[in-house]
Amino acid sequence: MATAPASHAFRTEVRKMLHIITHSLYTNREIFLRELVSNASDALDKLRFIRSRGDAVVAPDLAPGIDISVDKEARILTIADTGVGMTRQELMDNLGTIARSGSEQFVADLAAAENAKDADAASIIGRFGVGFYAVFMVADRVEVTSRSYIEGEAAHTWTSDGLGEFTVEEATGDIPQRGTVIKAHLREDAAEFLEKYRIEGILRKHSQFISFPIRVDGEQVNTTPALWREPKFSITDEQYADFYKHLTFDTEAPLRTLHVSVDAPVQFTGLVFVPPHGQEVFSMGRDRWGLDLYVRRVLIQRENKDLLPEYLGFLKGIVDTEDLPLNISRETLQENVVVRKIGQTLTKQVLADLARLAADDAEAYATFWRQHGKVFKLGYSDYANREKFAPLLRFNSSHHDDAQGLTSLDDYISRAREGQKEIWYIAAPGREAARLDPRVEVFRRKGLEVLYLLEPIDEFVLETLDSYSDFSFKAVEHADGEKLAQFEDTGPARDVTPLTEDEDAAFARLIERMKALLGDAVEDVRISHRLADSPACLVQPGGASTSSMDRLLRVLHKDESVPRKVFEVNRDHPILRNLLKVFTSDASDPLVEDTTRQLFATSLMLDGYLKDPHELAAMMHRLMEKSGDWYKAVRGL
């Protein structure tokens, strides 16, 4: 005999929540379907567990699944599952109190917002999945008919309009063999959720990897398997590639696939892919990065940025865990210890996998580096993983024949000369600019390899690392030429006639003259021990930042002044030897000043500090005019 409908009042916190839901507008109302499907999936999981224990269930031959249908004329959306079902008491407990279908954090936040505006409280609810009650975002009446898996239990129907009360009565009419059927009578402003394409879109977005078939009007929607849940040995490269293409809409296979399954310190599984093509650090769309976070195969957040650091933001993929509640908010995610532990563990796994790739296939790693190295270098500030990060860096260097060559820091050290304890580098806009920089000449002569830092971030990376494997990073312009003299020349000996004692003294006076001519424009003028083929160069005073770093900082601070540097001249260069002869003959000869200023201006130009190229051009024209006159006189023209 059917029981008469019994009316019950919701608990206070549920009434508050339902009031806000039914009197507010939501921009993310689609989550109601995610919540209902997730509940159905949980019910099916519970049934599977019960059957695995050998317990008897009602309708054992009933196939597991979730069916969704619509009745547009009656404005009814139906979600049915063949899961564990509920008894009358379970309907009362599970659908009558928020403690069973919401979160403790939600209750606390709702209480704090009791005196706030509806909009403020609504934002609290909007940040949380609130389980079954989310259906009242779109429905003004809900009927839940459920039959438990337990033999002999009758089916019951729970009904509510979301206004404070609900009824429970024994079910009549169309009763499920087992499981739960939810009929949501949709409000007029929720008509979109009666459209098949809209329902399918929501399911593909949030629930496409649910392990049970989800059908809409008889057609299965979730046809893509949750590949990360499958044993690694059973998955082919083609399956991984197909899944990557499905996930990212890319047309090419990934460069690398990492299938992760971790049980401690936190449980999670995942698939992480290295895309075949990279992005520029400051390109459009670079802020769209992160892994998709799933909880028990249900999408919680796309592009979650807490699962990986930004320097691994080029990675695409999915992380799935059972250690998080389904209704966790985005704000709570950022502070959640489980998410933090997943991120720390996953970062170590990715770095270890890249290290294996670098060791096993240098060419494949070089391909990875050329595509993603610019973003990867942002990891210079990841102090916790510095020892794993630094060996993965790659740079072009003077060891290579062209700009395509790449060397690791370990490779550099393996080629270091005996007694060398520095990793030398120079920052430049291109390889040729670095190779032809006057300050590199002594390193070429001594057979000392120099890293070419061709990206603005490179210098930040090395300065932050400071050292590697007992070798300190040092810019070539900070080199002490006299200390470099300890290394023997590796090339042919230079054919240079040494200055006589008188010439040496005269050159010292020439240096003083040049210093007087340049005045406050320079910190000092001195003889260079680093130049071989160039007549002059500028170097930073001891302890100062490099030229490239100084220029960058001046741009940031809008400082257009020219820094005072040390002007070094090569007394063995023909220009300086000829200038010495002119100076010895007539210290006041205009050519001394013209040549000094010309050498200084060209050095400024090479260092990136020349403010007025017209002045340099005028000096060049004057010297060309004079040299033309001398040439005519010598040739008797």
UniProtKB/Swiss-Prot annotation:
Cell location: Cytoplasm
Q: Which gene encodes it?
A: htpG
> Cross-referenced SUPFAM superfamilies, in alphabetical order?
ATPase domain of HSP90 chaperone/DNA topoisomerase II/histidine kinase (SSF55874), HSP90 C-terminal domain (SSF110942), Ribosomal protein S5 domain 2-like (SSF54211)
Q: Which GO terms describe its molecular function?
A: ATP binding; ATP hydrolysis activity; ATP-dependent protein folding chaperone; unfolded protein binding
SUBUNIT field: Homodimer.
Q: What is this protein called?
A: Chaperone protein HtpG
PANTHER family, alphabetized = HEAT SHOCK PROTEIN 90 FAMILY MEMBER
NCBIfam families assigned: PRK05218.1
Q: What does this protein do?
A: Molecular chaperone. Has ATPase activity.
- Name the PROSITE patterns on file: HSP90
Q: Which terms are listed as keywords in the entry? A: ATP-binding, Chaperone, Cytoplasm, Nucleotide-binding, Stress response
What is the top-level taxon of the source organism?
Answer: Bacteria
